[in-house]
From Swiss-Prot:
Protein name, entry field: Transcription factor E
Pfam families attached to this UniProt entry: TFIIE_alpha
GO molecular function: DNA binding
Record keywords, A-Z: DNA-binding, Transcription, Transcription regulation
Length: 176
């Protein structure tokens, strides 16, 4: 996938937005070709230098940017020259999908193996053992704890897991 195609993909835009937030999005959405300093980016984009640096370091932490330091011979100051590596985005997204799949599978097992009770007035859900310790009364409101069915949540999680497995081409059993 070409660099420009990546940046036009709404999934990629959402991913970058989740990483750097709204203030860092101008940095993430308009990466220059070649090396650039944080000061040049701040000036070019009309942003605060700290916002640019924050976005750059987040991109760096996610393997989407690298830097090299150059010391100015006259002043002794270090200049950071940044290069963007958005070719790593598809791999990063796939890793995120695997993490999500693992978390959903773990949560699904938890939901299946526990019975829950709800304090409707407080909007708090308790496991059976907690509810029993509390005498089936909400500690905040004193309202009785009512058993709740979580099958809809389980079904939704199963659908999402199936969808992720299909996208990742994993965990799908094939009949022979």
């Amino acid at each position: 996938m070409a660099f420009d195609e990546l940046l036009n993909d709404p999934v990629i835009q959402k991913y970058l937005h989740e990483l750097v937030g709204p203030t860092g999005m101008p940095v993430a959405a308009a990466p220059p070709d070649g090396e650039v300093t944080d000061e040049e980016l701040a000036e070019e984009l009309g942003l605060e230098l700290n916002d640019v640096r924050r976005a750059l370091f987040i991109l760096y932490e996610n393997d989407l940017a690298t830097y090299r330091r150059v010391r100015d011979e006259d002043s002794g100051w270090l200049t950071y020259l940044w290069t963007f590596h958005y070719e790593n985005i598809p791999e990063n997204l796939q890793s995120e999908m695997y993490r999500l799949l693992d978390a959903l599978e773990e949560r699904l097992e938890y939901e299946r193996s526990h019975e829950f009770y709800l304090s409707e007035p407080a909007g708090i859900r308790f496991e059976f053992s907690e509810a029993m310790e509390l005498g089936f009364q909400c500690p905040e409101t004193g309202a009785p704890l009512e058993p709740i069915e979580n099958q809809e949540m389980i079904n939704a999680m199963e659908r999402r897991i199936d969808s992720l497995q299909s996208e990742l081409n994993v965990g799908v059993t094939q009949t022979v």
